[in-house]
Amino acid sequence: MHFLKEIIDILNEDLGWELHDVVAEGAYGQYELDFGYTDILQMADRFVFLRVLLKEIAKKHGYFVTFMPKTNISDWRSGAHINHSVASIKTGNSNIYKDGENFSDKAYNAVAGILKHGAAITALALSLIHI
């Protein structure tokens, strides 16, 4: 599919985002794109930019992109999920566990931040209207 090939080339070759996986989701035309790690602010910027980029490239190829969890009553539903990773920016190592078993303070802080900002994350990433 020329649309996906162009997106993959732009993200990896032009932008250097380290796209490492494109997975077909449950319904026709649904895909999950998985990127290399970066800090949270840069990933948020990439997320917003990616939505605009996908819509523009799709339009160029005669397609329409939506991020709605479900586009109509009879269609397969979207997973409408966001994957999170907690890792050191300096080393890239996971810092979720402090001793291999118990959560670290950083892991608790990450979860607290997600819970505190859950409404905003949902509004931006899992919108019910087409944006």
Where are these regions (language model features)?
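Glycine-rich, acidic/polar active-site loops that bind/position phosphate-bearing ligands
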Residues: 1-128
